[in-house]
Structure formats: C-alpha cells, structure tokens
Amino acid sequence: MKAIGIILAGGNNDGRLGVLTDHRAAAALPIGSCYRAIDFTLSNMSNSGIGKVAVLTQYNSRSLRDHLMSSKWWDFGRKQGGLFVFTPYTSNAGSTWFRGTADSIYQNMTFLKRSNEEYVVITSGDSVYKMDYRKVLEYHKESSTSPAPKEKAPASKYLSLKARN
C-alpha cells in the first residue's frame, strides 16, 4: 500500500513540557542516550514501508533539523522517496507562520499534490510509541470508514479519536 508520511513536529507545546522545551522542539527532546522523541515516529514510518516522509517544523527547530540532517538511521534514501523537512516560509503569495496543524499541511499542499502515494499517514513527532501503520491503513481500507469530509469543518485545537479493538 503506497503511503506518504507527514510528521507534525512544529508546535510550541503551550508550556505542557515546561523548561524542557524552552530551547528545543518537543520532537527533539533526548530519549535515552542518543535518541530523540521523533526517532520513534520515524522508525514507525520506516518499518511500515513508508519511504517518503515530510517533517513539518516551526518553533525552536534548529536542534531537530540538526538531528534529522545528521542521521541516516531510518533508511529514507532518495531511491525510497526521502526525508524532507519543511518550515514556514514567506513568498509573493504571502505565506506566514503555521496557524495550527491543518494550516501546516495546507501550506505544504504542493508537496502532497506532487506525490504519487494513495494514502497519507499524519502523526505527531513528539509521541513515543511503536506502531505498524500498514495495519492502520489496512483497517481503514477494509472497514466502512469513509474518507475525511471535503466540506469545511470548524477549526479545533485538538482532535479526539476512539479506537476499536
């Protein structure tokens, strides 16, 4: 199943992690001796066969960018698609800082439109867990779950999902 990965790693965390994120993004927080929080999500993507991954960053992103650019642990070579890091930019079209997760994806819509993948897996970059996204995509494909609605929905800060066994 062809999928592209989007990792949301740009939030300012609204102070939920206190001084730990004063000078770095939550996704760049050290875990163990040589890992960062984002490494778990990147490993999940790689182990799920997702070879093209975009990391969307914003606040305090230097440490995260340095880590992503210096590591080749996840096997996102150009032949498989690659690892891309996007930050907000300004252009003649007047782009601004991301105004939330949906806006960060919207501002990078060109990247998605140019991809040939059938599915998009969107995850957080600061959560530590192990998951095979192929199983999630298979469930989505086999279930009666309909695609996300195309009509405009009211903006929300958080999204709640209920998991079924």
Stretches with model-predicted labels:
Residues M1-N165:
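Unchanged
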